[in-house]
């Protein structure tokens, strides 16, 4: 093939020399003529290697002058031209323009001659029955530069001789219909699966290579299927750089789902689910957030629901803890209205399924308390009590919270602060003063919240006090002493007076009044 290049260089040099002589008397503008240079690296041993004479070998052309001499001559001629300005058409007389156009004809003829020589050469290879991979190497397409997937010129698709090879493959397959060869195995000699995928995706963005790239992508997928490549492997190839947002409408994802269906049909004993590769690639939390958003869109609702069901099933089969799933579902960032969200209901169903499957039960409170802490749990309970559909869950959460305090040996006075005085929406402000020794003490409140003794929080705390005294008899605490430590005498007197007027609190008011008198 080097001989062809030499012929082109000689003819081009001759033509440029002729153009130079014709245009010598013309007035030029400031623009300069840029002469392209042959920059593709050629190995020294290939330059010096003599072409074999005409016989049954791969080349049929005698050797000619050295390429170095031709390039030197060509450079000398082009230097003469590039030192002059490029003429515009309006500055060139008609007769001169005609002469210039005529002088350019040899260049066109040189290109045409090179094309004919290349056609003759490829036809000779075809007659000899050379494989498509052999011709790929003869055209030196396997020696291109380091891949650059940002522009087509950085891939094999951007090399001039690539189209020659593509045409050869078509001609070879037309001549050998029973021995057709795919381009994919040859391209895989220079690219990994990932590299070829990137190159094909880039080629699909160019109108000149879109059709070929689309065809090759189909061949690549079929080869993966024939080789029993797992859907997980193919997913990694398809979604190399794609983000999880918009995944379900991504054309490559849609093509991948078809691959999964085809794989399961062809290999029924190795059936694969779509969800695991997605979760492995993006993570459970990102996938679940994406699926929740996709379920709200009619176009993707069905596939999102299907994938979410698969994800929950996989998590349950892998015995993932409810706490892990709680975070994976992004429930740790939901806020006070946690109990009323659809995702919490899904998680709660997971919790129940997990507890049926495992002897070591998980509580409703544990993951919520881990991320929201006690005060946050109190706010979630308060918000949940406002919604009829979540009242029972709120009560269940409050009871577990209460049991946690008791198990942790938190004294009733601390529980009173947490359950009543510091509850969300409380209308009192707790203040502290400092003693001489530097320790803080709580300042007694001069007001008791209205309806305190009839509130659910007080009833819960009262039960907590009884349970505490039963469980820790040597650490018994008195309700009257706790009240007197937290409230002023005037505040307690007003509380007792108001409680006497309420039939539901008359009994507790009487008990407290008697207890205050004994303290």
UniProtKB/Swiss-Prot annotation:
Keywords: Host cytoplasm, Secreted, Signal, Virulence. A motif (RxLR-dEER) lies at residues 49-59. It is found in: Secreted; Host cytoplasm. It holds the Pfam family PexRD54_WY. Disulfide bonds: none annotated. It comes from the Eukaryota. InterPro entries: PexRD54_WY. Induction: Expression is induced during host plant infection. Residues 1-24 form the signal peptide. One of its GO terms (cellular component) is host cell cytoplasm. Its main location: secreted. Effector that enhances P.infestans colonization of Nicotiana benthamiana leaves. Belongs to the RxLR effector family. The RxLR-dEER motif acts to carry the protein into the host cell cytoplasm through binding to cell surface phosphatidylinositol-3-phosphate. This is RxLR effector protein PITG_15278. It comes from Phytophthora infestans (strain T30-4). The lineage of its organism: Eukaryota, Sar, Stramenopiles, Oomycota, Peronosporales.
């Amino acid at each position: 093939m080097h001989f062809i290049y030499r012929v082109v260089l000689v003819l081009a040099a001759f033509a440029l020399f002729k153009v130079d002589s014709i245009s010598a008397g013309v007035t030029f503008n400031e623009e300069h003529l840029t002469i392209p240079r042959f920059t593709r690296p050629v190995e020294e041993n290939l330059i010096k290697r003599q072409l074999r004479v005409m016989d049954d070998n791969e080349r049929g052309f005698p050797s000619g002058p050295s390429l170095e001499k031709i390039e030197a001559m060509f450079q000398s001629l082009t230097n003469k031209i590039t030192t002059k300005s490029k003429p515009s058409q309006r500055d060139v007389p008609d007769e001169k323009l005609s002469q210039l156009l005529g002088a350019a004809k040899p260049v066109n003829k040189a290109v045409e001659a090179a094309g004919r020589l290349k056609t003759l050469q490829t036809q000779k290879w075809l007659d000899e029955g050379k494989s498509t991979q052999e011709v790929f190497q003869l055209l030196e397409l396997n020696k291109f530069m380091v891949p650059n997937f940002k522009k087509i010129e950085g891939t094999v698709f951007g090399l001039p001789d690539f189209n020659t090879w593509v045409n050869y493959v078509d001609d070879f397959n037309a001549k050998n219909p029973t021995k057709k060869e795919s381009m994919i195995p040859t391209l895989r000699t220079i690219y990994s699966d990932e590299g070829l995928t990137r190159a094909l995706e880039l080629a699909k963005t160019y109108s000149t290579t879109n059709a070929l790239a689309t065809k090759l992508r189909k061949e690549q997928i079929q080869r993966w299927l024939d080789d029993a490549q797992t859907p997980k492997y193919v997913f990694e190839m398809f979604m190399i750089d794609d983000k999880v947002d918009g995944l379900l409408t991504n054309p490559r994802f849609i093509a991948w789902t078809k691959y999964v269906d085809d794989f399961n049909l062809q290999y029924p004993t190795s059936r694969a689910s779509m969800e695991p590769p997605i979760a492995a690639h993006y993570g459970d939390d990102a996938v679940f957030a994406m699926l929740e958003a996709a379920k709200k869109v009619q176009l993707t609702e069905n596939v999102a629901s299907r994938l979410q069901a698969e994800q929950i099933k996989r998590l349950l089969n892998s015995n993932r803890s409810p706490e892990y799933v709680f975070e994976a579902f992004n429930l740790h960032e939901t806020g006070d209205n946690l109990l009323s969200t659809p995702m919490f209901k899904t998680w709660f169903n997971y919790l129940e399924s997990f507890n049926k499957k495992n002897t070591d039960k998980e509580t409703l409170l544990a993951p919520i308390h881990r991320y929201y802490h006690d005060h946050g749990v109190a706010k979630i309970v308060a918000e949940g009590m406002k919604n009829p559909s979540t009242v029972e869950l709120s009560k269940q959460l409050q009871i577990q919270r209460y049991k946690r305090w008791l198990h942790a040996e938190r004294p009733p006075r601390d529980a009173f602060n947490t359950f009543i005085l510091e509850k969300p929406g409380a209308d009192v402000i707790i203040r502290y003063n400092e003693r001489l020794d530097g320790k803080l003490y709580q300042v007694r409140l001069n007001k008791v919240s209205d309806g305190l003794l009839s509130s659910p929080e007080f009833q819960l705390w009262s039960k907590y006090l009884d349970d505490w005294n039963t469980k820790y008899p040597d650490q018994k605490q008195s309700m009257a002493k706790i009240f007197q430590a937290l409230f002023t005498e005037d505040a307690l007197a007003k509380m007792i007076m108001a409680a006497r007027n309420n039939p539901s609190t008359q009994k507790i008011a009487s008990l407290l009044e008697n207890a205050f008198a004994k303290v």
